[in-house]
């Protein structure tokens, strides 16, 4: 993220928390672990994402940002910028860690989303996310940009692919061109597109379509102002269709399965919010992102993370935060038209944020989040459900709280993330325990 970001999230440090109803039994959790995986104090290293190769579960990719911050981060901790990268990517770069032995050994390398060598006019990189498809192909989305001219169109989101577990990557494709991007077409837009920021990505494993929603400034025929868009690739990220405007900017984790893509959005200011004007809307496309429909809900708020049940068409879940700070699970079985509250995870004394969801093909629903105390310190928790969100087993993954950030801070800590296998929840998050932002990973086994 290119703007200041603060952390937040979970629950008390009990070994097991049972969700609604309190007497229900959730999955059994064991083998909890955490580990710091980045160590270069010249950079603030956070905003991570994680994916596990379904063809080889020992192959894991973890992406994160190497935040230079014009040298402030390194100088603050006794490591002034001295290498070439610090001068060429003066604000942010994007890196990955890859392992082929389940995390015993990691290899770090720069992701070819952006660099000075690729394009000196937009060398910085941010906002990376990673996922694997069922064939073992990895996809990473990220931004390349120049600061501060990204605000006027010198920056966009791009996608790269890897066919060898993250060792090598394809050349990037442009997802939604801005004014100064390759593929820019002001004539077709009848105006301009500029300022790309904070995106999310989903894969429909049934159709193979990739979806990205993000924030983009537009002064064009389809939208005016800071808006949210939905872009679709129907050929594995090689090319992208026109990114359709869907409403007020509020990018959040989206979900796709069985030909349906779904995510939440604030209710329109000019109506369309249904009976509850302070409740979120659900945006749905059933034609591969060519058009969208908007459904009002009775779920308070303006956004909530979404996840798709890969076993059943039209089945999705939303995790929203209620007035008491709990995570409340809502489900739909008709593609977003109607929602039912099915479960709840209490987060006593903390504020849940940076929520990330996953739903395995085996039917395990998972969630991870960071829980912030009133003083700004936080820990990381994960939870899994075997009954579609009615009951959860919750486990703290981080051993101790991270202190809040008290130093110089520019950007680069938007996300935490989880990934489910058939019997494990893996998680990654940014942590300030060493006084510098570093990436941790952890998880647990469930049965």
Give the ranges of each region predicted by the language model.
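C-terminal PAP-associated
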Residues: 25-447
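Secretory targeting and sorting signals
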Residues: 2-24
């Amino acid at each position: 993220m290119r703007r200041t970001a603060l952390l937040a999230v979970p629950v008390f440090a009990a070994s097991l928390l049972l969700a609604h109803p309190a007497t229900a039994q959730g999955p059994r959790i064991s083998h909890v672990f955490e580990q710091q995986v980045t160590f270069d104090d010249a950079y603030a290293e956070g905003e991570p994402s994680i994916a596990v190769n379904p063809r080889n579960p020992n192959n894991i990719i973890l992406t994160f940002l190497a935040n230079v911050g014009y040298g402030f981060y390194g100088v603050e901790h006794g490591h002034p910028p001295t290498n070439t990268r610090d001068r060429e990517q003066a604000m942010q770069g994007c890196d990955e860690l890859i392992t082929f032995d389940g995390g015993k050994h990691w290899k770090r390398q720069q992701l070819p989303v952006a660099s000075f060598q690729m394009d000196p006019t937009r060398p910085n990189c941010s906002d990376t996310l990673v996922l694997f498809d069922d064939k073992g192909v990895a996809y990473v989305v990220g931004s390349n940009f120049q600061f501060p001219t990204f605000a006027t169109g010198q920056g966009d989101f791009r996608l790269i692919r890897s066919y060898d577990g993250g060792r090598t990557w394809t050349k990037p494709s442009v997802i939604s061109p801005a004014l100064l991007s390759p593929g820019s077409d002001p004539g077709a837009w009848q105006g301009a597109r500029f300022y790309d920021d904070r995106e999310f990505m989903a894969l429909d494993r049934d159709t193979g379509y990739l979806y990205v929603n993000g924030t983009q400034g537009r002064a064009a025929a389809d939208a005016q102002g800071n808006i949210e868009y939905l872009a679709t690739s129907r050929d594995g990220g090689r090319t992208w269709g026109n990114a359709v405007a869907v409403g007020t900017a509020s990018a959040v984790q989206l979900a796709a399965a069985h030909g349906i893509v779904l995510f939440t959005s604030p209710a329109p200011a000019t109506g369309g919010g249904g009976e509850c004007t302070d409740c979120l809307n659900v945006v749905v496309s059933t034609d591969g992102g060519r058009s969208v429909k908007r459904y009002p809900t009775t779920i308070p708020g303006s956004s909530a993370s979404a996840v798709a049940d890969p076993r059943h068409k039209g089945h999705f879940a939303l995790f929203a935060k209620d007035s008491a700070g709990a995570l409340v699970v809502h489900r739909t079985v008709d593609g977003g038209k109607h929602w039912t509250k099915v479960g709840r995870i209490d987060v006593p004394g903390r504020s849940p944020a940076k929520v990330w969801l996953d739903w395995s093909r085996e039917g395990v629903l998972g969630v991870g989040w960071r829980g912030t105390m009133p003083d700004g310190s936080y820990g990381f928790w994960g939870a899994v459900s075997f009954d579609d969100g009615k009951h959860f087993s919750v486990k703290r993954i981080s051993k101790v709280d991270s202190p809040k950030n008290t130093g110089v801070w520019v950007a680069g800590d938007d996300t935490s993330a989880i990934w489910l296998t058939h019997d494990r929840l893996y998680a990654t998050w940014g942590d300030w325990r060493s006084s510098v932002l570093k990436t941790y990973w952890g998880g647990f086994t469930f049965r």
